[in-house]
């Protein structure tokens, strides 16, 4: 990755242009390597962005703030990471997986800018296939609002490293929609790119 280091509104930032995924054959330790890199550079706060499918009626196509997560990938980076021996404990607490004050901050910024955002629980799955109707039904029963193929392992790693976490999502489709394709996901993402940028800039300005 060709990362970018600079400032946004005088806030020092490190920006990574993408991520690797478990479904590409990488391990959970490899998938979370950018989180460790950011912490090594001195980052205390980290903002994760992900594309998701909206699972419930309370989550619509558009921007959302993640409030909690369910790891359905069957992986955990703390099992595979050699550096776990240097962490105080491998039994990392995941209460407030997404830092409350950052969630509140993002909600306030969205309201001030007139950007519509939903909030909800995120389920991370292995992928790369989209979910079956039965799987979506299970997630609804579990209280899931959004589903995607990333992020949950990265959040675990961030907590192990003592970082504050904000999760922002763009729900690009309603999960279970038979017309969903990779191309349609990219098309919807493009429509919301400007609002997403404004939201992130607004949050950074207040950090």
Segments predicted by a language model, with ranges:
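Polyanion-binding loop/helix "lid" in catalytic or ligand-binding cores
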Residues: 87-98, 104, 136, 189-200
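His/Asp/Glu-rich mid-to-C-terminal helical/loop segments that flank catalytic regions of hydrolases
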Residues: 175-207
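Metabolite-binding pocket within alpha/beta catalytic cores that recognizes anionic/polar moieties
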Residues: 1-94
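Zn-dependent metallopeptidase/amidohydrolase metal-coordination segment
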Residues: 149-185
């Amino acid at each position: 990755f060709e990362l970018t280091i600079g400032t946004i509104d005088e806030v020092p930032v490190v920006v990574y242009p993408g991520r690797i995924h478990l479904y590409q054959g990488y391990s959970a330790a490899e998938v979370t390597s950018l989180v460790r890199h950011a912490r090594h550079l001195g980052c205390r706060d980290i903002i994760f962005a992900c594309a998701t499918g909206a699972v419930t009626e309370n989550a619509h196509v558009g921007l959302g703030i993640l409030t909690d997560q369910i790891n359905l990938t069957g992986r955990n980076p703390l099992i595979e990471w050699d550096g776990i021996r240097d962490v105080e404990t491998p039994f990392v607490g995941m209460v407030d997986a997404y830092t409350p004050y950052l969630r509140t901050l993002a909600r306030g910024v969205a309201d001030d800018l007139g950007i519509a955002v939903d909030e909800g629980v995120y389920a991370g799955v292995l992928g790369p296939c989209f979910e079956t109707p039965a799987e979506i039904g299970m997630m609804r029963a579990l209280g899931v609002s959004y589903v995607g193929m990333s992020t949950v392992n990265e959040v675990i790693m961030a907590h192990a490293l003592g970082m504050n976490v904000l999760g922002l999502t763009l729900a690009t489709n309603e999960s279970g929609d038979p017309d969903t394709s990779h191309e349609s996901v990219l098309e919807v993402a493009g429509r919301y790119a400007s609002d997403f940028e404004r939201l992130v800039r607004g949050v950074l300005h207040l950090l």
